[in-house]
């Protein structure tokens, strides 16, 4: 997983904890290597980090199916992480009973991978998207598939660290462009 070292090299000293956490949460996860990297890819997409998405997408850790599934799950969560909080924030009990009529056919095929992996990628993206309804839903489904609390904690840790790395890299790229003073 060369992408981890490539990402760590981009993080400045003030983000040393984030740099060290990248190793801990991805390379030493209780999840399978595929699931850990897929969760990182989905979280990077949700964090809108093209740099991290490209680094993971170019790495050979994920096969084409899991790469596509992580991106599909994250894209769907980009929609759902807005829709479901909107319904909740509206406070309209009638709206909560109306079908969203948003296309989500990828759920039927789990993005081309097993259901557990697809739900795990959706959870990682929803954590970054901060959709409480979505996090609860995916978390519960994953518990029902047999994932442990520790494994689900690791999804949260991956999402948190990837999100932090994305923020640091976004700011640092602006500093390099001269848009911000260091």
List where the protein language model places each region.
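Hydrophobic alpha-helical segments
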Residues: 1-182
């Amino acid at each position: 997983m060369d992408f981890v070292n490539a990402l760590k090299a981009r993080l400045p000293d003030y983000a040393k904890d984030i740099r060290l956490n990248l190793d801990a949460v991805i390379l030493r996860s209780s999840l399978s290597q595929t699931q850990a990297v897929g969760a990182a890819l989905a979280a990077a997409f949700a964090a809108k980090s093209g740099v991290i998405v490209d680094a993971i997408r170019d790495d050979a850790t994920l096969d084409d199916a899991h790469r596509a599934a992580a991106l599909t799950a994250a894209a769907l969560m980009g929609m759902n992480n807005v829709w479901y909080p909107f319904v909740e924030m509206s406070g309209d009990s009638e709206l909560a009973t109306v079908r969203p009529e948003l296309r989500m056919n990828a759920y039927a095929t789990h993005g081309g991978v097993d259901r557990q992996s697809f739900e795990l990628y959706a959870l990682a993206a929803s954590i970054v998207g901060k959709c409480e309804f979505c996090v609860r839903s995916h978390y519960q489904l994953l518990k029902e598939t047999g994932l442990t609390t520790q494994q689900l904690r690791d999804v949260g840790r991956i999402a948190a660290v990837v999100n932090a790395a994305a923020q640091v890299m976004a700011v640092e790229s602006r500093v390099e462009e001269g848009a911000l003073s260091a």
